[in-house]
Amino acid sequence: MLVVIGTMWRGTFWSRLPMMAVFAVIFNKMIGGVTGVYLSDVPADQYFHGNMFVTAHFHYMLMGAGLFGAMGGIAYYFPKMTGRYLDERTGSIGFWTAFAGFQITFMSMFVAGLQGQPRRVLQFDNMFNISNWISTIGAYVIGIGMLIFLAAIISSWRSGQVAPSNPWHAQTLDWQTQTPVPLDNFPVLPVVTKLPYDYGVPDPLDPKTLEKQYDEKVGAPS
């Protein structure tokens, strides 16, 4: 997480869905990391390790990064996979709905853990009903958000706005190939023009231009 924050430090970033997913992952990881401090403390862990507090903690660490990271990755690579943009409006509604549901679900689990609700039990005391009802509602909200996001994927795949080969103006090699991606990825070896972590030409080019650049770099065959 520190690497991600350090990468953004003094940088310019934009408010599109893939970037919002990065912020969501950072937020969830921060919550998971802070609550993990309590689980590393022996006196506190004696109380927390067998109840819903630790359940909420590892969901923030694993699901909080995996789910929203996957949604951001889909939004980012959707133009490369399909040649079309993911519907930003519908996708964002689904994303933020799932994010809100995630907070409702697992924040209430922290409360249940602080109250002492044990994990891995079928029945529990009535004092935990409110926390569990709130958590259940949050889980349904996550599901609704995922369905909306799935609808954005399906509708965009069918009739979304056509995207260029490199809509993000990225300079990494995965965006230097054509869309749709040809069988061999590159017709010629890609030209590396910059340092390792900002390599590539500014925009993907057609095969003839790439081949011309390659010939200029290594010498045209005689």
Describe the residue ranges of each PLM region.
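Metal-dependent phosphoesterase/phosphodiesterase active-site architecture
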Residues: 95-98, 138-141, 221-222
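Accessory "access/gating" subregions that flank catalytic or transport cores
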Residues: 7, 24-35
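Hydrophobic alpha-helical membrane-insertion segments
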Residues: 25-29, 94-107
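Hydrophobic alpha-helical transmembrane segments
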Residues: 60-67, 132-146
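Extramembrane terminal tails and long inter-domain/linker segments of multi-pass membrane proteins
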Residues: 118-127, 156-222
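Juxtamembrane membrane-water interface segments of multi-pass membrane proteins
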Residues: 1-21, 37-54, 69-94, 108-130, ...
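Residue-level detector of functionally special positions within alpha-helical transmembrane segments
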Residues: 32-36, 59, 110
